[in-house]
């Protein structure tokens, strides 16, 4: 029998263990009983904006990583998975993609993916925190690939709900907004009202015929408060739209299976069986993650996950 102290090192020994492996560490509280420690090479940038603490750090395993209010948001190593899953299924499902609205996404990565589609004529990105946009435009242009300078793009520094009060409609609406609760159960009052039935219903009212709404809808670990918050978001979206489908993929930097939910008001085969191969080939798109094969896998959930709802 192995002595317990050989399996579970006492916390008193933790500082020594960390110092011998990496000089700097980032601690992220995933829940009340689960903490993630990431080794950091360097803190590249830090600014307290009007809305949040913005930090950019070079992680030993994740590369350059965006941290907002102590939570990892975008990591160089796997952001392409998250953004491919958020953007490209919606672009395939929509009947037309001429006009696209992005809510949040101040890092410019979702915008970068939308602009890969030649049929996109106009994109409006609505971001409440101007410092987010300026940070990525100036410090990390290789992430955005010049997306903010594209002539098809209009940037609005505003609350996401403001544009929904205007007399405009869209073929695709993408929500890259931070979910209202983190894994520990703490509430984010800034985004809480952006995940209500009223808000999602307002989005549905701004979609053109056979338009598609895509939203990042949090993560799943099959334990703890993270799952409960995800289920609440999914049920709220389902209450506002006639048809919904949820995609699932593990994101290493989030330590969870992450989800994107797609919704529309018309029951069309384009959302249940979209022409992925044809759409990608016609537009000359060879994406890093999203393919016809990965599309099928994204929408194939294990029974234990389906039973959450």
Spans of model-derived segments:
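Glycine-rich, charged/polar anion/phosphate-binding loops
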Residues: 39-42, 52, 160-161, 245-249
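SAM/dcSAM-binding transferase cores
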Residues: 2-55, 257-309
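A general beta-strand register signal
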Residues: 67-68
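Active-site lining segments that contact anionic ligands and/or coordinate catalytic metals
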Residues: 63, 210, 258
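N-terminal glycine-rich anion-binding loops that anchor highly charged ligand groups
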Residues: 54-64
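Conserved S-adenosyl-L-methionine
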Residues: 216, 241-252
């Amino acid at each position: 029998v192995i002595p317990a102290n050989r399996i579970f090192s006492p916390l008193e020994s933790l500082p020594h263990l960390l110092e011998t492996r990496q000089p700097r560490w980032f601690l992220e509280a995933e829940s009340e009983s689960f903490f993630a420690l990431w080794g950091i090479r360097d803190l590249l940038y830090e600014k307290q904006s009007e809305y949040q603490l913005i930090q950019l750090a070079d992680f030993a395993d994740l590369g350059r990583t965006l941290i907002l209010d102590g939570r990892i948001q975008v990591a160089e190593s796997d952001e392409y998975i998250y953004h491919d899953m958020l953007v490209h299924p919606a672009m395939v499902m929509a009947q037309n993609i001429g006009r696209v609205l992005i809510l949040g996404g101040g890092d410019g990565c979702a915008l970068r993916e939308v602009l890969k589609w030649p049929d996109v004529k106009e994109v409006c990105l609505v971001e409440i925190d101007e410092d987010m946009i300026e940070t990525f435009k100036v410090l990390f242009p290789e992430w955005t690939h010049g997306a903010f300078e594209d002539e098809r793009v209009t940037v609005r520094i505003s609350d996401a709900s403001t544009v929904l009060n205007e007399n405009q409609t869209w073929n695709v609406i993408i929500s890259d907004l931070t979910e209202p609760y983190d894994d520990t159960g703490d509430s984010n009052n800034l985004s809480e009202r952006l995940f209500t039935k009223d808000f999602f219903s307002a989005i549905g009212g701004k979609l053109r015929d056979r338009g598609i709404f895509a939203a990042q809808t949090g993560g799943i670990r099959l334990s703890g408060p993270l799952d409960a918050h995800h289920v609440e978001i999914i049920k709220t979206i389902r209450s506002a739209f006639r048809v919904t489908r949820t995609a699932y993929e593990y994101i290493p930097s989030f330590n969870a299976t992450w989800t994107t939910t797609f919704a529309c008001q018309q029951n069309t085969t384009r959302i249940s069986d979209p022409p992925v191969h044809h759409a990608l080939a016609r537009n000359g798109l060879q994406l890093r993650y999203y393919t016809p094969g990965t599309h099928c896998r994204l929408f194939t959930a294990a029974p234990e996950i389906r039973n959450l709802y």
